[in-house]
A protein has these predicted regions:
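Alpha-helical scaffold segments that flank or form the walls of functional sites
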Residues: 83-157, 197-214, 465-470
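Active-site gating loops and adjacent loop-to-helix segments of metal-dependent hydrolytic enzymes
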Residues: 81-113, 167-192, 256-284, 306-309, ...
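N-terminal metal-binding scaffold of metallo-dependent hydrolase/deaminase domains
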Residues: 1-53, 64-65
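C-terminal cap of metal-dependent C-N hydrolases
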Residues: 404-461
């Protein structure tokens, strides 16, 4: 075999890894060498010549798969410390346990620890890019600075947005205002509440969108959900997105309650949030709608016609009784589908392998007729589609010269891979994350031999343990408060699930 010369400027070579190349066979990928120059992929070849140059790092990837780094297209770092705390809690009640408006102001130490811990978990599971839709409530500039410094230090790529709203959560959940006594209304909130002290969107434009770019930090806009944002706020959001060329992430139809709220409050748009967004000119390729569980067929057609994307989060949607998204209908319509792992308090794990497997299984279970190969579809959702939704489709999500060197190497010396019958299917249906050995972000090896290289991992774990007594104390107080609210929560939830909609997304065997 003739060897190709090493591209000029090469700083790192990955040798002999089976790589998922854009035009390659992902079921039986070929072994190749990948040359990286600085932060970009400089070349891919069946073999590059060896040179005696101590400045070039080499990774022997024999017995490894090389993947584009996963893109976690929907994530919230504000509740990383709450993993494993909840189950059998419907979405509307979950918000009262887990989300920042219910908590006292947090310390900078806690904000730093949770940001680093969440990023560490993502990196160790092969994610090189995360879309952090962060709620800081009440907003403190020093907390935002702390978050950005943590991301810069740990070395992950982040598509960052602050989550904002201008309508109170109480006004956006069916039946709450009628059922709860007025004296309890102040205790009710949702994902983001209106900021009284600051124009959060204006602040974000001045300090982030209009600021000099950073190598691994990309900006996005995060209107919490259409029902929580006035038409004026959504219009302003989309104007900024188009002016600065940044993506927009918002929640839509995560639960039956969110779909019901649209039916109750939008008669002029046929009870449809999607039609409301269309009327406001918000639909289009810049918009990513997280969850999308309770979409109607004509709404799916609108998304497809406008190039609007969705981000599915199957783990949390199942755990919080939200339902099964219409995956096959979205695929058949040609809607862009990204994948996310959502909150640690509902999905619990930032694990893209779990998300991909659930995606493939739910797609299979949602239609009795054979459809597209779901392992390949899941992998593309976790890489290319997430990159496209972030307006980074020409920079990440593919192993191709000119793209950023964001790569994950999977060690196949494991029962998961013996025998190796089909790389794509075993990645999605068998691998659980144990095989992630090396992770490269922006050309830098940030995980080597399963250990973080940028920060001592024990430093992160120690910082978490220091802040956990305060977090647990506050969480216990919240649990007591929600316990007192439970009779009215149960009444509202029962009314929500008993109100008929034109279709269902919950599996009911009898």
């Amino acid at each position: 075999m003739s060897l190709e010369p090493i591209p000029a400027g090469t700083t790192l070579i990955i040798r002999h890894g089976r790589a998922l190349l854009p035009r390659g066979d992902w079921h039986e990928p070929d072994a190749v060498d990948i040359a990286i120059a600085g932060n970009v992929i400089a070349g891919v070849a069946s073999g590059f010549a060896r040179v005696a140059d101590a400045s070039i790092d080499e990774i022997d990837a024999r017995g490894h798969l090389v993947l584009p780094g996963f893109v976690n297209a929907h994530y919230h770092s504000h509740d990383v410390l709450a993993k494993g705390t909840l189950e059998e809690v419907p979405l509307e009640s979950w918000r009262l346990y887990a989300l920042p408006p219910q908590y006292p102001p947090r310390s900078m130490e806690e904000v730093r620890a949770r940001t680093l811990l969440g990023a560490l978990e993502c990196l160790r599971c092969g994610m090189t890019t995360i879309q952090d839709m962060l709620t800081l409530y009440p907003f403190e500039e020093r907390h935002l600075d702390t978050v950005m410094q943590a991301y810069e230090r740990i070395g992950i790529r982040v598509v960052f947005s602050l989550q904002y709203a201008d309508r109170r959560g109480l006004e956006t959940i069916p039946y709450w205002k009628d059922i709860f006594p007025k004296e309890l209304h102040a205790q009710l909130s949702t994902a983001a509440e209106p900021e009284r002290q600051i124009d959060l969107l204006g602040y974000f434009e001045r300090t982030c969108l209009a600021a000099p770019s950073r190598s691994r930090v990309h900006w996005a806009l995060g209107p919490s959900a259409p029902e929580r944002c006035s038409p004026a706020l959504m219009t302003r959001t989309m104007e900024l997105a188009r002016r600065y060329g940044v993506p927009v992430y918002s929640h839509i139809y995560e639960s039956r309650g969110m779909a019901l709220q649209a039916r109750l409050t939008l008669p002029e748009q046929g009870g449809s949030l999607i039609k409301r967004l269309a009327a406001e000119g918000a639909l289009g390729p810049l918009l990513n709608l997280a969850h999308s569980v309770w979409l109607a067929r004509d709404e799916i057609d609108l998304l497809a016609a406008t190039g609007t994307g969705v981000v599915l989060n199957p783990q949390g949607n199942l755990k919080m009784k939200c339902g099964i998204p219409p995956i096959r209908a979205l695929q058949d319509a040609g809607v862009r589908i990204g994948l996310g792992c959502d909150n640690c308090s509902c999905s619990d794990a930032q694990n893209m392998f779990m998300a991909m497997k659930l995606f493939a299984l739910l797609a299979a279970a949602s239609d009795p007729l054979p459809g597209p190969p779901q392992a390949i579809a899941a992998l593309r959702a976790a890489t290319e589609a997430g990159a496209e939704g972030a307006c980074l489709g020409n920079a990440i999500g593919r192993i191709e010269p000119g793209y950023k060197a964001d790569l994950t190497l999977i060690d196949m010396s494991d029962p998961t891979w013996s025998p190796l019958n089909n790389a794509a299917r075993q990645l999605v249906h068998v691998e659980a994350g144990r095989g992630v050995r090396h992770v490269i972000v922006n050309g830098a090896v940030v995980v080597r031999d399963r250990r973080l290289t940028t920060i001592d991992e024990d430093e992160i774990y120690d910082a978490v343990e220091i802040v956990m007594p305060g977090f647990r104390r506050d969480f216990a107080a919240i649990c007591e408060r929600v316990k007192r609210l439970q009779p009215w929560l149960d009444q509202a939830h029962q009314r929500m699930v008993s109100t008929e909609l034109e279709f269902d997304r919950i599996y009911r065997p009898f």
